[in-house]
């Protein structure tokens, strides 16, 4: 419970979860929390008071804002507390490589990235390539994207496996983030939002 609001999170053992699913199988739609509060039987439901920060991510804009908050060291320290480690799937990739002449500042750059251009105030997932002469600013670039030479990405979220061709400009604004799904682009394209 956060400020007397449910965080809509619950922990249920597998056996109980399967019983709930079987019991409500005929319902067109039923939220797990609704089932726990419903007439399923006598389930012992307890709450846990969480005193840390809770943020909801319900839109592309909130995803962008909350992700970019991680660039603030205070926020990152709260989330990545060594006393509460976050365990994720390990990938066997080399560390990120920064070429001579590249520039990266105030960014989270995951393993396996190759940085030859400029990255500022951005979050790069595993395996992103930023070629020489390319720039990424205030953006979230997901797994295995390639930002080709001369391309410019600003205030954007790119889905994984996108290739931003040479001399392409993708630019949103802080209030109107550009979101690029899996979409092939051609060289010299400009998308401004």
Can you say where each PLM-predicted feature lies in the sequence?
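Left-handed beta-helix
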Residues: 25-193
């Amino acid at each position: 419970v956060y400020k007397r609001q449910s965080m809509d999170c619950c922990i249920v053992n597998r056996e109980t979860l399967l019983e709930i699913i079987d019991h409500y199988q005929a319902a067109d739609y039923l939220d797990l929390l609704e089932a726990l509060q419903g007439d399923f039987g006598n389930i012992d439901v307890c709450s846990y008071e969480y005193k840390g920060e809770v943020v909801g991510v319900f839109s592309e804009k909130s995803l962008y804002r909350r992700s970019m908050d991680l660039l603030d060291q205070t926020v990152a320290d709260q989330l990545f507390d060594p006393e509460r480690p976050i365990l994720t799937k390990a990938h066997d990739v080399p560390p990120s490589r920064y070429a001579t002449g590249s520039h990266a500042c105030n960014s989270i750059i995951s393993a396996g990235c190759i940085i030859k251009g400029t990255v500022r105030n951005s979050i790069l997932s595993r395996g992103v390539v930023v070629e020489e002469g390319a720039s990424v600013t205030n953006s979230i670039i997901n797994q295995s994207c390639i930002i080709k030479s001369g391309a410019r990405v600003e205030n954007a979220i790119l889905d994984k496996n996108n290739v931003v061709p040479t001399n392409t400009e993708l630019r949103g604004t802080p209030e109107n983030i550009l979101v690029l799904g899996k979409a092939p682009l051609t060289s010299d394209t400009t998308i401004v939002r």
